[in-house]
């Protein structure tokens, strides 16, 4: 089932949009797991994981704002992302959940856990830490902005443009999963490139606001990735004192895609599903 809807939120007095999601195992009654993708991603990236974990507990794969089939907005702060999660849970009557986020999604769930600690059972953060990161997506953003949808008429033509700027074929393939045909039979990006470009520094380069989440927390690092370094553990423990850091072998930043079996097993063990 896929949901795209609006609701009145207790967080505000005005009508607010609810994040788009796909739910696995929704007939199960144990604590649900909410899963959030990274920058330029969407819930479809997590389909196999959702189907697997959905045998054990309800799994909500969720599109962040300005991504996938979720609503577009001109704001994109960590607080915005955290409030979106709270509003989503209110809409579905979820008082408390396990939350998992990869990369940008990891920043969203960290901010959520600090802002709404009573609503988090267990926190899982995938290949990102609470620290500030230097900007490192400028080349990708420039490539995406170079695509002129008034002149390109096929996925192959879009790939040809991106290939001029992005050497990694896997990155180009990942980005082009976001292509869709609009009502005017014109190609476009599902993500809101304008806001993601304008607010990039705010949501990628900024550290998570200081605060403490004292619940059970797991940080999962890719062995081939440099997003979580040994020296980051001190800063992680300052905000997440019960955090454990586990490294998944044979995986870079895209841990769940590059070593899905070991990744899923680490998550299952942490959630007590094995």
Regions found by a protein language model. Give the residues of each.
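Flexible "cap/lid" loop of the alpha/beta hydrolase fold
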Residues: 111-114, 121-153
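Conserved serine/cysteine hydrolase catalytic core
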Residues: 184-239, 244-247
């Amino acid at each position: 089932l896929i949901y795209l809807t609006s609701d009145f939120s207790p967080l505000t007095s005005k009508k607010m949009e609810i994040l788009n999601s796909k739910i696995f195992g929704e007939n199960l009654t144990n604590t649900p797991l909410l899963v959030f993708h990274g920058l330029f991603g969407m819930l479809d990236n997590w389909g196999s994981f959702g189907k697997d974990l959905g045998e054990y507990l309800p799994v909500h794969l969720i599109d962040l704002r300005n991504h996938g089939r979720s609503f577009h907005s001109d704001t994109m702060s960590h607080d915005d992302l955290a409030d979106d999660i709270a509003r989503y849970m209110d809409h579905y009557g979820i008082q408390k959940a396990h939350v998992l986020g990869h990369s940008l999604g990891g920043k969203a769930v960290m901010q959520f856990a600090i802002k709404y600690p009573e609503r988090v059972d267990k926190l899982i953060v995938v290949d990102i830490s609470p620290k500030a990161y230097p900007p490192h997506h400028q080349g990708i953003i420039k490539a995406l902005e170079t695509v002129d949808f008034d002149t390109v008429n096929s996925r192959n033509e879009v790939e040809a443009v991106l290939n001029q700027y992005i050497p990694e074929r896997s990155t180009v393939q990942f980005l082009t999963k976001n292509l869709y045909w609009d009502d005017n039979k014109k190609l476009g990006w599902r993500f809101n490139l304008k806001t993601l470009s304008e607010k990039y520094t705010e949501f990628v380069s900024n550290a998570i606001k200081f605060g403490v989440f004292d619940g059970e927390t797991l940080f999962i690092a890719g062995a081939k990735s440099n997003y979580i370094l040994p020296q980051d553990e001190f800063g992680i423990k300052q905000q997440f004192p019960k955090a454990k850091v586990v490294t998944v072998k044979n995986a870079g930043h895209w841990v769940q895609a590059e070593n899905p079996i070991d990744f899923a097993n680490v998550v299952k063990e942490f959630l007590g599903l094995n």
